[in-house]
């Protein structure tokens, strides 16, 4: 299994629509202002977070149960900035839509700028033939409110190509988050 380079990522994005919209270079500034970078990098792709967020709140006391998720524990916010309360959590989604090839898996890692501020980003792997916008999980590990910037880089996807296509892909097993659009809540 090999990590794939910028040349391969660009070719797959342009010929197979693996990432859409696709930015073929690192964007680090907008309107002469520094931003959290996004776009193609040497061995990965820095994805942007959209302006749709779901923020956990404790206004309705409940227990978070992944088997019976109660969305009343979330506040939906459409904004260029998301403020995550101290020691809390928010969901976002990528601007980019991904279509994974059958012989490729992608791993997501967080941006160091966010990590150095105590904001941790988690995404499970993009399995072979996974398709859709990717729901991002932001955890504010600090005792202070934390800010997330919509339209800017949030995480980096690294692409690994297997020595042959897998026998059973995410699509073959009817993965529950196939073709998700926007923030997708947990389901079992």
Curated annotation (Swiss-Prot):
Keyword flag Membrane? no
Please give a single GO biological process term from the UniProt record: dUTP biosynthetic process
Enzyme Commission number(s): 3.5.4.13
The superkingdom of the source organism is: Bacteria
Q: Where are the membrane-spanning stretches?
A: none
The active site is formed by 137 (proton donor/acceptor)
Top EC group: hydrolase
**Pfam families listed in its UniProt record:** DCD
Q: Name one GO molecular function term.
A: dCTP deaminase activity
Spell out the reaction equation it catalyses. dCTP + H2O + H(+) = dUTP + NH4(+)
Q: In which pathway does it act?
A: Pyrimidine metabolism; dUMP biosynthesis; dUMP from dCTP (dUTP route): step 1/2
The keyword Hydrolase is annotated on this UniProt entry: yes
Q: Which residues bind dCTP?
A: 111-116, 135-137, 156, 170, 179-180
Q: Which keywords does this chain's UniProt record carry?
A: Hydrolase, Nucleotide metabolism, Nucleotide-binding
NCBIfam families listed in its UniProt record? dCTP_deam
By its UniProt entry, which PANTHER family does this protein fall under? DCTP DEAMINASE (PTHR42680:SF3)
**What does the record note on quaternary structure?**
Homotrimer.
Q: What does this protein do?
A: Catalyzes the deamination of dCTP to dUTP.
Q: Which family does it belong to?
A: Belongs to the dCTP deaminase family.
What is the name of this protein? dCTP deaminase
Give the species: Orientia tsutsugamushi (strain Boryong) (Rickettsia tsutsugamushi)
As recorded in Swiss-Prot or TrEMBL, the protein's gene is named dcd
